[in-house]
Curated annotation (Swiss-Prot):
Residue intervals on the Cytoplasmic side: 469-479
InterPro entries for this protein: Flav_gly_cen_dom_subdom1, Flavi_E_Ig-like, Flavi_E_Stem/Anchor_dom, Flavi_E_Stem/Anchor_dom_sf, Flavi_Glycoprot_E_cen/dimer, Flavivir/Alphavir_Ig-like_sf, Glycoprot_cen/dimer_sf, Glycoprot_E_dimer_dom
Organism whose genome encodes this protein: Louping ill virus (strain Negishi 3248/49/P10) (Li)
Residue ranges of the region described as Fusion peptide: 98-111
Xref: Gene3D superfamilies: 1.20.1280.260, 2.60.40.350, Tick-borne Encephalitis virus Glycoprotein, domain 1, Viral Envelope Glycoprotein, domain 2, Viral Envelope Glycoprotein, domain 3
BP GO terms, sorted: clathrin-dependent endocytosis of virus by host cell; fusion of virus membrane with host endosome membrane; symbiont-mediated suppression of host innate immune response; virion attachment to host cell
UniProt name for this protein: Genome polyprotein
GO molecular function (one): protein dimerization activity
GO CC, alphabetical: host cell endoplasmic reticulum membrane; membrane; viral envelope; virion membrane
Residues in compartment: Extracellular: 1-447
Length: 496
């Protein structure tokens, strides 16, 4: 699965009868949805971008100077005059120079002098700013079912589906082939203040240098370089890259301050680099909050017969995925298709299956299958696939796992924010409370009661509530009632 290869992975586990779950998707992360009676699905935010954003200013990094002219007058003869002084695209400077008999003046004193030079910009020496439009930013979300096929990190799963969302998008339904349909309704949010963000792009001159950065609008507007708007042929403040020398009689030198690319690159050290792909300008941060409908998903292979247990061999022995799960792959030499008999037992409990399958109902197909992912309790375990067995020690602790999943649930609810609550009606408010409980405690509940059936969990919740009603100690009574209520809510709830 896609999520197996990513470091930032989250699990959202639906309880019995779950039809909808709420996810928080962020760039670089991946969420695996598991629910009883449903295929597991990976969902991730693949990209945030805008096509062809609008240009704002262009800055010149290296001036191109030409047609230098100088005019001078003797003392008392009035100001020097050049017609170019009032032409657009020309940089001029007025000053006073020492005049006398040695340079063709009858009087000694200060005379007027003016120098002008035509200023343009060297080719491939521009820095251009682009602005985002929140209404045109596209969020690409991808969905992939767990089919039991191993897919390398650099390969694309044949069942992968892609959809896009904008601020005006509505619900999308994706067809996952034999696994049914999944619906997505996503609310988008960029991780940056778009009104204050500029993409600064340099003309491409060297392959080893980055070409674009995500900068603040105020910093961009304060750059001390010549600038112009798109389509304007003349540069404003061109004098910023021109220096005039000290005047001598009828002469004034003009100097080009040279290429400012290195100065700009030094100023951009540590600034987030922007990614540009063709005409797509990507954002580096942001998230979407998606409500995923699971009601039309269906498990594949439930009618298959069980595989012959003696005809399995390891293709990839059990390995730690890095996400508190175990992954493995087997090959099968018997008749296909069929269901893979897989289970795991803990030390001292040989009759209790402790494996929580992330790949539900693993199968061998005519053209693939055999990849299995599962979660095991901390400690010594033995994994069985048919007659194959493998001893496995799962690191960590049950308490630590509960705290970790609860922390992730709180983070998820915090990101969802105000969208998690419906104050429009009493029913909506209580539904929001149920959803919040599922979001925060769903993972912890599954860690504790993952191997317990629906009826035992229901009876446990009822028993705790009954103890709470019949206990005279107020503290004990409230504790039992709260615990019983949570167990019943997590057992009977249909949304996470």
């Amino acid at each position: 699965s896609r999520c197996t290869h990513l470091e930032n992975r989250d699990f959202v586990t639906g309880t019995q009868g779950t039809t909808r779950v709420t996810l928080v998707l962020e760039l670089g992360g991946c969420v695996t949805i598991t629910a009883e009676g449903k295929p597991s699905v990976d969902v991730w935010l693949d990209a945030i971008y805008q096509e062809s954003p609008a240009k704002t200013r262009e800055y010149c990094l290296h001036a191109k100077l030409s047609e230098t002219k100088v005019a001078a007058r003797c003392p008392t003869m009035g100001p020097a005059v050049l017609t170019e002084e009032h032409q657009i695209g020309t940089v001029c400077k007025r000053d006073q120079s020492d005049r006398g008999w040695g340079n063709h003046c009858g009087l000694f004193g200060k005379g007027s002098i003016v120098a002008c030079v035509k200023a343009a910009c060297e080719a491939k020496k521009k820095a251009t700013g682009y602005v985002y439009d929140a209404n045109k930013i596209v969020y690409t979300v991808k969905v992939e079912p767990h089919t039991g096929d191993y897919v390398a990190a650099n390969e694309t799963h044949k069942g992968r589906k892609t959809t896009t969302f904008t601020v005006s998008s509505e619900k999308t339904i994706l067809t996952l082939g034999e696994y049914g349909d999944v619906s997505l309704l996503c609310r988008v949010a960029s991780g940056v203040n778009l009104a204050q963000t500029i993409i600064l792009e340099l003309d491409k001159t060297a392959e080893h240098l980055p070409t674009a950065w995500q900068v603040h609008r105020d910093w961009f507007n304060d750059l001390a370089l010549p600038w112009k708007h798109d389509g304007n042929p003349h540069w404003n403040n061109a004098e910023r890259l021109v220096e005039f020398g000290v005047p001598h009689a009828v002469k004034m030198d003009v100097y080009n301050l040279g290429d400012q690319t290195g100065v700009l690159l030094k100023a951009l050290a540590g600034v987030p680099v922007a990614h540009i792909e063709g005409n797509k300008y990507h954002l580096k941060s942001g998230h979407v909050t998606c409500e995923v409908g699971l009601e039309n998903l269906k498990m594949k292979g439930l009618t298959y017969t069980m595989c012959d247990k003696s005809k399995f061999t390891w293709k990839r022995t059990p390995t730690d995925s890095g996400h508190d799960t175990v992954v493995m792959e087997v090959t099968f030499s018997g008749s296909k298709p069929c269901r893979i008999p897989v289970r795991a037992v803990a030390h001292g409990s040989p009759d209790v299956n402790v494996a929580m399958l992330i790949t539900p109902n693993p199968t061998i197909e005519n053209d693939g299958g055999g990849f299995i992912e599962m979660q095991l309790p901390p400690g010594d375990n033995i994994i069985y696939v048919g007659e194959l067995s493998h001893q496995w020690f799962q690191t960590g602790s049950s308490i630590g796992r509960v705290f970790q999943t609860t922390r992730k649930g709180i983070e998820r609810l915090t990101v969802i924010g105000e969208h998690a609550w419906d104050f429009g009606s009493a029913g909506g408010f209580f539904s929001s409370i149920g959803k919040a409980v599922h979001t925060v405690l769903g993972g912890a509940f599954n860690s504790i009661f993952g191997g317990v059936g629906f009826l035992p969990k229901l009876l446990m919740g009822v028993a705790l509530a009954w103890l709470g009603l019949n206990t005279r100690n107020p503290t004990m009574s409230m504790s039992f009632l709260l615990a019983g209520g949570l167990v019943l809510a997590m057992t009977l709830g249909v949304g996470a």
